[in-house]
Amino acid sequence: MIKKALSWEIALWVSLYRLTFRRPAPIEEGARRFGYVRPIAPVLGVFIVVSAIDIVAVDLAIHHFLPSWGWLRTVALVLGVWGLLWMIGLAANILTHPHLTGPSGLRVRNSHTLDLVLPWETIATVRTRSRYLIDGATVQREGDVVSIAISSLTAVDVVFREPVTLALPKGPAAGVTELRFHVDDPEALVAHAQTFLQDPVTA
């Protein structure tokens, strides 16, 4: 639990640094980045705004009702700013870990918690298809299909030539024949993927 919390904390601050100073992680030549934040952007925006308002509201409340407790104002301010930066870092963590398509393969990600590297030779086809999943979990498996959803949505289907094993956050998933995931611009991702696919199989 502590190790997981620490990894989250480090990842958020690194992502915040990369986003603030516009220093994205390098990618291979010919690769493109594709975001997947759009469905949850409004929610993240609300949390960030609320966190900022809370800082001011708590500071004013302490100043008004407990004017002699200067130390409490300082503590509350530090915690409030940390919480605000944490929320911004959460958004940055998604923005700085986009999906990638490039010469070496397709890379499907979900912040720093999931990173699937799929060589093109393992893929039969990549196609657009919008789906809404009833289960609200981000990572789902149903039979031989794995879904990486954002706000219960997926937009791209990846069909493998043969069953593969995917390294998921809760452990490896063997015998997977299809991966579904969300991306903000599925048509562009699929079009770029098609330029790398070898003898794509139509389905």
Question: What name fits each language-model region?
Answer:
Residues 66-81:
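Hydrophobic alpha-helical transmembrane segments
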Residues 1-68, 174-180, 191:
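N-terminal membrane-targeting/pre-transmembrane regions
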Residues 144-203:
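A membrane-cytosol interface segment of integral membrane proteins
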Residues 84-130:
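Conserved beta-hairpin
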Residues 48-58, 77-88:
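Hydrophobic alpha-helical transmembrane segments of multipass integral membrane proteins
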Residues 114, 124, 132, 164, ...:
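Residues that cap or initiate secondary-structure elements
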Residues 136-145:
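Short, surface-exposed loop/helix-turn segments at secondary-structure junctions
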Residues 117-119, 135-136, 167-168:
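Extended hydrophobic-aromatic, low-complexity segments
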